[in-house]
Amino acid sequence: MKGKIVFFEGEKKFGFAEEPIPKVEDGAVLVKVLCTNICGSDVKNWKGSSAAAAGSKPSCQGHEFVGEIFKLGKGVETDSMGQPVKIGDRIVAPYFITCGECKACRAGRYDLCENAYIHLGTDPSEWPHFGGTFASHYYIYPEQMFYKVPDSVPNELAV
């Protein structure tokens, strides 16, 4: 089975790819993207006016989304708040990963983690392929937080 990806190729240019749906490593989650936003950083990349666009290498884009759990890696039973999860549940996830060890993380400022962006802008031709939400699927790494979305919250608000 293959999934579809829209990726950044360079200034004002996006490409399209189909890649195999990856096997999910222990502790990871694969999500079927239901709804995604276009963020200001995505627009800056498209215009070529961001640091991420400077290298102009192929990179997955999109990071504000709501999705449905498609595959669960071994050991994943709850979200980052301890709520039980199963295949089919809707979730959201911050696009950054927090190390929990740097000065910012120790101060509770996970948004300023020094190691937060190690998986942002991944090449769509490299495993796990689905590193952005402008795609049919999105890969959530074992160290990445995610949260179950209540049934009462519509996709358009959850994203």
Predicted regions and their residues:
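Extracellular beta-rich ligand/substrate-recognition surface
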Residues: 6-13
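Short Gly/Pro-enriched turn/cap motifs at secondary-structure boundaries
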Residues: 9, 20-21, 56-62, 125-130, ...
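Residues that act as N-cap/strand-start positions at coil-to-secondary-structure junctions
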Residues: 13-16, 53, 132
